[in-house]
Amino acid sequence: MGLKELYESLSSEQREFQFGRIGVNPLTEGFPRKRVVHAGIDGTPVNPREAQKIWQGLMSKKPTGKPTQTAYIHIPFCKTKCLYCAFFQNGTDQAVEDAYVDSLIKDLERECHELRLKDGLIHSVFIGGGTPTSLSAQNAERLLRAIRTCLPLANDYELTLEGRIHDLVPEKMDVWMAEGVNRMSLGVQSFNTKVRRQVGRLDDKDTVLRRLEELQAYNQCVVIIDLIYGLPSQSMDVWRDDLECLMTSAADGADLYQLNVYDNSDLAKRIQAGALDPAATTKEQARMFEFGREYLMKRNCRRLSAAHWAKTNRERSLYNTLAKTGVTMFPFGSGAGGRVDGYSTMLYRTLDTYATAVEEKKKPFMALVKESDIQPLVNKTLAQIEQGYFNVDLLVGEDPRLSDLKWLYDLWEKQGLVENNGVLYKLTTAGEFWQVNLAQTTVECIQYLVKGVESMSLQGVAAQDGAETKAVSEKVEKIIAAMKKAKSSGAGPTPEAMKMMTEAMQSMSPEEMQEVMKHMGK
């Protein structure tokens, strides 16, 4: 059965959810709601008893040539929790932070001697969180020196430190610039003081602009800010002012992200209680996206990927681009994720469990998954769509069974989501807004055409439109129950739990995944 026959066999609800709506405004109504892209499909969990041996085997082999590679380092601390955030792990405590950095450096020092790492090159390092800039100046110095000592950085490496405006103080900035940070990614979210403080940001508009100038005065790094559209009290006029502030600020570029409100999140509870104005609906966010896109393009900003824009020629957004292509990503730190030579992994989220594994000279992962043999096709697909296009012929050249994808993209052309320029399909403005939906459905269709597996699901994503979603699904509850059973028996994570986790990763929202991660390794 081809894609057309599959399409015709679906219920009207599932047809619209997977393939989009016909005869509507494609920008505001192209799909019923946003989806989540699940890049890893059909993976096979490794038996926990064999996982360490397999990892050691991977790391003991020399890389083939000098492939482009990245490293992700996770700092799981925040001084405050922003209402919209699904990734908060731990508050700050100096003694806990000191001990964690000790463990993180040991993890780096142990792995740096492995051939797979030391004989290659690292082109991009991303220190994410959490709030990495919350580290004390001393701990930041220790960690950055360990990174430059342990990782084989390429001459043109990008080293990004993620953080918040409130941490931009001289004693910290001096260390960051002296120890090799050449890109700062800062969560501004909005320049509007009221909007910022409503969601947990501390500094007012003038302070934000001043501190960006103070950071840029070092002239040692790219300065990037995150802006979110759709926040409570963020009208179109406020959004316009945010974009104007971006253009006049010292930032070299920005990432424009759509707000998703998840049921049972702190933000949703505050809105439901009447303490905050409602967030923008998806239709309103679509118009904000369109306005932001046109505003930046008219001012000659360069589009680097779906959400990333450059104001100056210093910004490359290298890590963000490479992460979408499936390149090797060496993970370090509690909660970090990565992939090496056909295997993906997630490191322990619980600090004590992470530290214990490091002391035992083990890679501190809670799960190791062998990727599907069609993962390379998926990676190429996601990399293209992230850049705003899709070339069917390139994929058909690798697997003729994918020729039916032309039917899918011809359908989307009729719906106003893509345009065929004679060589490939370019996403329209509407297609760019619904890019995650196009990407996920394309991945599912690839799996269907190559594997004969229909894995399309109707999971909810955001609650800003009043849609009913569960913060903890039945699948999540089953995984947690299995992990608790393993803990009580002392046996550790079972193959059954690993299998369920792998399957769940294909269909869960970020909120659901975070709920699982809270319990993995406890």
What are these regions (language model features)?
Residues 1-69:
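Flexible, acidic/Gly-rich N-terminal and inter-domain linker regions that tether
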Residues 71-73, 186, 427:
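Short beta-strand motif preference
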Residues 92-114, 120-398:
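C-terminal scaffold of the Radical SAM
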Residues 463-522:
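Extended, compositionally biased non-globular segments
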Residues 78, 252, 421-423:
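Beta-strand-connecting loop/turn residues
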Residues 65-102, 193:
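Canonical Radical SAM [4Fe-4S] cluster-binding loop centered on the CxxxCxxC motif
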Residues 334-468:
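Charged, E/D/K/R/S-rich low-complexity terminal regions of large eukaryotic assembly subunits
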